[in-house]
Amino acid sequence: MKTFSATPADIDKKWILIDAEGVVLGRLASIVAMRLRGKHKASFTPHMDMGDNVIVINADKVQITGKKREEHFYWHTGHPGGIKSRTKQQILEGAHPERVVYQAVKRMLPGNRLSRQQMTNLRIYAGTEHPHEAQAPEVLDVKSMNKKNTRS
């Protein structure tokens, strides 16, 4: 039997809505990355963008375990003495709290052109409102998938 290799005509993209309120960040990012790549489908083909379109709401209410809220992100501006840092807590309380979820998902995908294309299928919103009601997204309840996905 020949190995199945999907063609662009075989790809069926769905819209998935995930509520991130109270969900552990790493577990959420792992589930979202798997959906973006399409590894949950039996027809998965590694070189094709066959994942679903994923909408994540309430990204500002994501749960972070342990002392990871106090861990620093470091970057350099390129200027002398230009080392900068922020904690996850500062980012979540800042203007763009959805960036914590975005970076977690991005770092769970391979670092190639295909994963950059797959990241365009991810939409993250800090609040409950999103402009994708017309796509009729299917709700994926991450909390009920496993009791370890949420932390009280």
From Swiss-Prot:
Ranges where the record places region Disordered: 129-152
- A GO CC term? cytosolic large ribosomal subunit
What domain of life does the native source organism fall in?
Answer: Bacteria
Does the record's keyword annotation contain Ribonucleoprotein? yes
Record GO biological process: negative regulation of translation; translation
Keywords in alphabetical order: Ribonucleoprotein, Ribosomal protein
Q: Which SUPFAM superfamilies match?
A: Ribosomal protein L13
Q: Does the keyword Ribosomal protein apply?
A: yes
* Gene Ontology MF term list: mRNA binding; structural constituent of ribosome
PROSITE patterns given for it? Answer: RIBOSOMAL_L13
Q: Identify its protein family.
A: Belongs to the universal ribosomal protein uL13 family.
Purpose of the protein:
This protein is one of the early assembly proteins of the 50S ribosomal subunit, although it is not seen to bind rRNA by itself. It is important during the early stages of 50S assembly.
The subunit structure is: Part of the 50S ribosomal subunit.
Q: Check the record and name the HAMAP family matching this protein.
A: Ribosomal_uL13
Can you say what this protein is called? Answer: Large ribosomal subunit protein uL13
